[in-house]
A protein has these predicted regions:
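Well-ordered alpha-helical segments within folded domains of soluble proteins
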Residues: 308-311, 365-369, 418-422, 479-485, ...
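Elongated alpha-helical scaffolds that mediate protein-protein interactions in large eukaryotic proteins
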Residues: 1-288, 295-307, 314-365, 373-395, ...
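Extended cytosolic coiled-coil "rod" domains of large eukaryotic scaffolding/tethering proteins
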Residues: 338, 449, 513, 565, ...
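Alpha-solenoid helical-repeat scaffold
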Residues: 34, 74-77, 427, 437, ...
Length: 886
């Protein structure tokens, strides 16, 4: 009746009493339907809340349930944002009543179900206006997981899952529109729902169905980075890992837990997830479920899940704090990695057979990768040795004939082969004795011989390790050389001797020629890397061994020369030319210097000229190594003449180039000089700006001071050594400025000794007070250093004055020369004017003729000759005074 209906508003009741009556039955029915709709539309939520809060609510159970049904009916299309806070309050009141009255379970679940529908808004701004209230309301859903009802908990999880359903309701109340698709998800993030659900896992630990629903909800929530961070606060990773080996015939427990772990790894800090998984309990759980899937998982899905867990295990292996070895997981994985190659029965994998499916192929690659990770853990090295990892990996260092692997395709075998050889480069240096006992050097050299052979082979080049190897054997060559590089770089005498005894130097030179010829056809990063690695191997093998340098000499120098002649433009190509050039220079230093036969051949090939050409490019990163090589080469008496003979652009000499480099170095160091390059600071003429700022820092006796360290940190010491070898007298091609700088270079060692004494004095005065005689001696030493500075400054001034005087003399000579040129030009001009006058002016011509006649008459003899012929001085037809040729 209307009196018992708390859902009706006063306005509706008055309209029913005073409204206009209809005249026929159909109008009355329509009116009754409208009234019922109005009743539903005008549910008084505050009244219902008061009704549920009534202390005598036990007697009002039917009334309360009826009111709740009206609420459910009223909001069957979705909850308006403005009413959401009251609905959640009703939910909480229902949850409280459930403890004593089970009848409230169903309406509570129905109300929770409504929360899964899209919320409704009247205005666009409602989403922002109600955001705080909505986020708190959604958070309350998570808190309702405390209600001890399986039905309620499952419904909450279903509600959360429905947040990700973008399907819109079929009908909406007039004036309302659904909120945006991601609104609920954003509010769930804001309210921290994910963290609450993770904590609720403790409540459903023994209820499999509820647990699976919570995991399903978390699986959806974990697609967001914000939710993943909230979950990590609740230790989600460790909680989920412990569920991995729980009893679940459906397999959903492992699947959903591992899926959430993956999302956590992708969306949060990998280190934080790994740290949470690094407890002994978690590692043991991971090991158990992995072993179970390995031995009993035959479905495609099981193998994929097994591989996912293997990736997580690899991440754990990267963490030194994870008890992988203590749990026995590491040993299981190593045994599994070498199972098909070593074929030694092991109880850990008894009865296991690989099917050569794609998932097993992926697992094999993951296991190889894991060995690479374990090689970085010193504690795992013993396990790698005991389980024959080196022999297993060496099974792949053979020509591509698929020995014993009849079920892998050619492309798969090649990928495994390259991966295994790449991992061998990481493991071999740790197990050198095992490496040598397996004749690994021999296998690698034979394999490299096959790589440059003419056998028909088409590399697939499909994998990461196969880059650049399509249609050739370059990928195999690249990784085999990496293995050799990794063991040779140990500088272990046994390894290097074993290689050289098998003719490695000659074979490496052949491979280098092969790669260099290939590089002429098409340069790429792989070929450049191969060449650089071979040059490094030769450097390491030949260093400090004259006999090996002699084996290298002629053929090696011929190969090195083109590298030093490299086009400078290629150094910045980004392909690796710069690294290749450095490797070539290092090889020159290690394989040529110290062997006179090789040195002389290098000089004969004009190698010194090439080095100076490189130095003249002024590539700062090349200075140290080139200058070092030149200094070492100067021990050969023929070298200095080659250096002195060299000429660069604009006829630049080597001495001028070296002095220019000195000035450039001092400019970068901030050494104080005046505008003419003269010394300014007599006490510390070599000190740069940074050295002066540092001052004198007391250091232990076994630590070099700044003045000593500075020698190796810049090129001035090498430039000084080289100029000492050339001699400071009669250096060609130097200007006055060069001589000013040369005066400093010549006294570099004196200044450096003075710097060391200066540091020594400063350190002594900080802790001791020298006695009179010692103080006097220190004072004399300091004065000697300053006197040297003043002497050099005076010499520099003398050079500059001499240059100035010479310039004045040159200027005077030039001026005199210019005067002579002007005078000569005036005479030529005057002569030309006379010539023009004589040839162009008629009066002048007549005058010239008269003068000519007078001159002729005057020259005649006064005595008349009898019977003599008289010749006329006039020539008929003469019309010019110059020859016809002009």
């Amino acid at each position: 009746s209307p009196a018992r209906s708390p859902a009706l508003s006063p306005a509706l009741r008055s309209s029913r009493c005073g409204g206009e009556r209809r005249g026929n039955a159909s109008d009355a029915g329509a009116d009754l339907g409208a009234v019922q709709d109005a009743q539903l539309r005008s549910v008084d939520l505050n009244h219902i809340i008061k009704l549920l809060e009534d202390s005598d609510s036990v007697n009002l159970e039917k009334e309360q349930l009826k009111a709740l049904k009206k609420v459910i009916k009223r909001f069957e299309s979705g909850l308006p944002l403005k009413d959401l806070a009251q609905i959640i309050e009703i939910l909480n009141l229902c949850a409280e009543k459930m403890n004593e009255q089970e009848a409230f379970t169903e309406p509570l679940c129905e109300l929770i179900k409504l929360c899964g529908l899209p919320f409704q808004k009247k205005k666009l701004s409602d989403e922002v206006s109600y955001s705080v209230a909505v986020s708190k309301s959604i958070a309350q859903l998570g808190y309702l997981m405390r209600v001890p009802s399986s039905q309620v908990r499952i419904q909450i999880c279903k509600c959360v899952v429905s947040f990700y359903n973008t399907e819109l309701p079929r009908k909406l109340p007039s004036g309302y529109q659904p909120t945006s698709a991601n609104y609920k998800i954003q509010m769930a993030e804001l309210g921290g729902l994910a963290e609450t659900l993770v904590l609720s896992l403790a409540l459903v630990e023994n209820q499999l169905t509820e647990k699976l629903w919570v995991l399903k909800a978390l699986q959806h929530l974990s697609s967001s980075g914000v939710n993943c961070r909230l979950m990590m606060k609740a230790q989600a990773a460790s909680r989920l890992c412990l569920y991995l080996n729980g009893v679940d015939p459906s397999g959903q427990l492992v699947f959903r837990s591992s899926e959430i772990l993956w999302n956590l790894l992708e969306n949060t800090s990998k280190e934080e997830v790994v740290n949470q998984l690094s407890s002994l309990e978690c590692v043991h759980a991971l090991k158990e479920v992995f072993a179970d899937l390995l031995m009993h998982g035959f479905r495609h899905y099981d193998r994929q899940l097994r591989n996912d867990l293997l990736v997580i295990a690899t991440l754990l292996a990267e963490n030194p704090a994870a008890p992988m070895i203590e749990s026995g997981f590491t040993k299981l994985l190593i045994v599994l990695a070498t199972l098909t190659e070593v074929k030694i029965p092991n109880p850990l994998v008894k009865g296991l057979k690989l099917t050569y499916s794609y998932e097993d192929f992926e697992m094999k690659k993951l296991l190889f990768n894991l060995i690479g990770v374990l090689s970085k853990d010193p504690c795992a090295v013993q396990l790698l040795s005991e389980n024959d990892v080196i022999p297993a990996l060496l099974c792949y260092v053979k020509p591509n004939q698929k020995p014993g692997f009849h079920d892998w395709s050619a492309a798969q075998y090649e990928e495994l082969q390259l991966h295994a050889i790449a991992i061998l480069a990481s493991v071999a240096p740790l197990l050198v004795e095992k490496y040598l006992s397996c004749q690994a050097n021999t296998l690698l050299l034979v394999f490299l011989e096959w790589c440059i052979g003419q056998d028909p082979f088409i590399g697939q080049g499909n994998s990461f390790h196969g880059t650049g190897g399509r249609g050739n054997k370059l990928a195999q060559m690249r990784y085999s050389l990496r293995v050799l590089r990794s063991v040779v770089s140990l500088y272990d005498d046994a390894v290097n001797l074993n290689l050289c005894d098998q003719g490695a130097i000659s074979q490496l030179l052949d491979i280098l020629k092969y790669a260099a010829n290939k590089s002429k056809e098409k340069e790429d990063a792989i070929l450049l890397e191969i060449q650089a690695d071979i040059l490094f191997l030769l450097s390491a093998l030949c260093e400090n061994d004259i006999h090996r340098k002699e084996l290298f000499s002629y053929e090696g120098v011929d190969i090195l020369i083109p590298f030093i002649q490299m086009d400078p433009k290629k150094l910045h190509s980004g392909l690796g030319h710069s690294c290749l050039l450095f490797s070539a220079l290092d090889c020159l230093w290690s394989c040529v210097i110290g062997c006179y036969m090789a040195e002389d051949y290098f000089l004969e090939k004009q190698g010194i000229f090439l080095l100076l050409d490189l130095l003249a490019l002024k590539q700062k990163n090349l200075y140290n190594i080139i200058l070092g090589i030149l200094v070492e080469f100067c021990d050969n008496p023929k070298t200095t003449s080659h250096i002195s003979t060299w000429r660069g652009e604009k006829d630049q000499t080597a001495a001028n180039l070296l002095i220019q480099l000195w000035r450039q170095e001092e400019l970068e160091l901030g050494v104080q000089r005046d505008r003419y390059g003269k010394i300014v600071d007599m006490k510390r003429p070599l000190a740069g700006s940074f050295q002066k700022q540092q001052g004198v820092i007391p250091t232990p006796a076994n630590c070099p001071s700044f003045a000593i360290v500075e020698v190796s940190e810049n090129i001035r010491a090498k430039l000084y050594s080289l100029l000492c070898k050339l001699g400071f007298e009669s250096l060609p091609g130097l200007s006055a400025q060069d001589f000013v700088t040369l005066a400093i270079i010549r006294h570099y060692m004196d200044f450096k000794v003075g710097e060391v004494w200066s540091e020594l004095c400063a350190e002594l005065k900080e802790e001791f007070r020298p006695v009179g005689s010692d103080e006097e001696a220190l004072k004399v030493i300091s004065e000697i250093s300053e006197d040297t500075g003043r002497m050099v400054a005076a010499l520099q001034t003398e050079v500059l004055e001499s240059q100035h005087h010479q310039e004045i003399q040159e200027e005077e000579k030039t001026y005199t020369k210019i005067q002579g040129i002007h005078k000569q030009r005036e005479m030529i001009s005057k002569s030309w004017q006379n010539f023009l006058t004589r040839t162009s002016n008629y009066e002048a011509l007549k005058k010239a003729k008269r003068l000519q006649e007078k001159s002729i008459e005057a020259s005649r003899s006064k005595l008349k000759t009898q019977n003599g012929s008289v010749h006329s001085t006039d020539i008929k037809g003469l019309g010019t005074t110059v020859s016809s040729s002009q």
